[in-house]
Amino acid sequence: MLSFCPSCNNMLLITSGDSGVYTLACRSCPYEFPIEGIEIYDRKKLPRKEVDDVLGGGWDNVDQTKTQCPNYDTCGGESAYFFQLQIRSADEPMTTFYKCVNCGHRWKEN
């Protein structure tokens, strides 16, 4: 629900005062409207899991293949862990995900 200031017509924002009472306050003028009898919910962003967490840290249990790391100039890696997933439609080829054994760099091939 959007509310606007009756004095200057700017949007009112929810703020909490020192007493713990929530108010709708205008940033442009001193207008404040106390909020009573309404529950206020706060949205929080949850951290996303890394690919290692999704696999349960099981990169060591997946197959290895000889392939050159895209960061070969810096790490010299010539083997990588890999697994395949069907992430597109069934008539498309599977996507192969790689992780370099030396530096841990991850990449994929369609």
Swiss-Prot record:
Keywords: DNA-directed RNA polymerase, Metal-binding, Nucleus, Transcription, Zinc, Zinc-finger
GO cellular component: nucleolus; nucleoplasm; nucleus; RNA polymerase III complex
Residue ranges covered by zinc fingers (C4-type): 5-29
Cell compartments where the protein resides: Nucleus, Nucleolus
Pfam families to which the protein is assigned, alphabetical: Zn_ribbon_RPB9 (PF02150), Zn_ribbon_TFIIS (PF01096)
Signal peptide positions (record): none
Keyword ATP-binding: no
CDD domains: Zn-ribbon_RPC11 (cd10509)
Binding-site residues for Zn(2+) 2, renumbered to this chain: C69, C75, C100, C103
GO biological process per UniProt: termination of RNA polymerase III transcription; transcription by RNA polymerase III; transcription initiation at RNA polymerase III promoter; tRNA transcription by RNA polymerase III
Binding residues annotated for Zn(2+) 1, in chain numbering: C5, C8, C26, C29
Broad class of the protein's primary localization: nucleus
Subunit structure: Component of the RNA polymerase III (Pol III) complex consisting of 17 subunits.
Family: Belongs to the archaeal RpoM/eukaryotic RPA12/RPB9/RPC11 RNA polymerase family.
Name listed for the protein in its UniProt record: DNA-directed RNA polymerase III subunit RPC10
Native species: Saccharomyces cerevisiae (strain ATCC 204508 / S288c) (Baker's yeast)
Source species taxonomy: Eukaryota, Fungi, Dikarya, Ascomycota, Saccharomycotina
Gene: RPC11
